[in-house]
């Protein structure tokens, strides 16, 4: 059995400036996005992306992630708390970002970017889909370092079970690390390989929706459910699981619709 290290929330300080782990993880995520985006553009030059377009895409994506992720946390998971403490809504350095809200925010941002750049919406989402899991991995690692979003108590004796002393003395699943491995590394590997070859328009986006939806749905069985708009558990499923259901359905529908389309 392991004990959570209880990291200092401050990663490092430079003079009066303190950098929190959560903010550092976001910086790492954006750097990974830019680096891998350039690699992806070079290996698939026929997609027609240049460095300036990638810089603009990052700016739009960053705004979509931060604004959408925070609003999603407020509206989907903790509306009562944030409506009672409205000043906390802007305190993103303390953590509390919803993937599903960030996902919707990115969709809006990519639509706006597509209109500005002249690229089609699906052309944009197909390009960024393989890059997103690295950001998810960095975010979940930040959750683990912050000691938040811990797992459910283990039902069997497993050597990697972890005690979070500020919660209770029960050994729990380190579900944040499960999500780093699943929604982060595994999903990245699948999409990176899948997108290396020409695919029909929308196919890579569809694979992301299916892959993320399935992996997040599974991870929720090991994670302590967040309170949310559907209640902590509704019909045996968490709010995040309910939000994954339409993602998977849309992904399957999109993928099916591309079966006879030409690869690009």
UniProtKB/Swiss-Prot annotation:
Pathway: Protein modification; lipoprotein biosynthesis (diacylglyceryl transfer). Keywords: Cell inner membrane, Cell membrane, Membrane, Transferase, Transmembrane, Transmembrane helix. GO terms for cellular component: plasma membrane. It is found in: Cell inner membrane. GO terms for biological process: lipoprotein biosynthetic process. Belongs to the Lgt family. This is Phosphatidylglycerol--prolipoprotein diacylglyceryl transferase. The gene is lgt.
């Amino acid at each position: 059995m392991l004990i959570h290290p209880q990291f200092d929330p401050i990663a490092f300080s430079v003079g009066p400036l303190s950098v929190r782990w959560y903010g550092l993880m976001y910086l790492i995520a954006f750097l990974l996005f830019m680096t891998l985006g350039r690699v992806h553009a070079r290996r698939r030059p026929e997609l027609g992306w240049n460095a300036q377009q990638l810089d603009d895409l990052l700016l739009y994506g960053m705004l979509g992630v931060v604004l959408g992720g925070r609003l999603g946390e407020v509206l989907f998971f903790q509306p009562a708390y944030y409506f009672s403490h409205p000043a906390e809504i802007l305190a993103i350095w303390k953590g509390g970002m919803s993937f599903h809200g960030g996902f919707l925010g990115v969709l809006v941002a990519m639509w706006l970017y597509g209109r500005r750049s002249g690229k089609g919406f699906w052309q944009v989402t197909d390009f960024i889909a393989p890059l997103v899991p690295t950001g998810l991995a960095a975010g979940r690692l930040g959750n683990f370092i912050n000691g938040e979003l811990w797992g459910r108590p283990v039902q069997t004796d497993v050597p990697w079970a972890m005690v979070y002393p500020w919660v209770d003395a029960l050994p729990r699943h380190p579900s944040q690390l499960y999500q780093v491995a699943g929604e982060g590394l595994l999903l990245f590997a699948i999409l990176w390989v899948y997108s290396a070859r020409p695919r029909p328009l929308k196919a890579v986006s569809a694979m992301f929706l299916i892959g993320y939806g399935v992996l997040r749905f599974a991870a929720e069985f090991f994670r302590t459910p967040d309170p949310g708009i559907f209640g902590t558990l509704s019909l045996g499923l968490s709010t995040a699981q309910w939000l994954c259901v339409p993602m998977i359905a849309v992904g399957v529908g999109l993928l099916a619709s591309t079966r006879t389309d030409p690869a690009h």
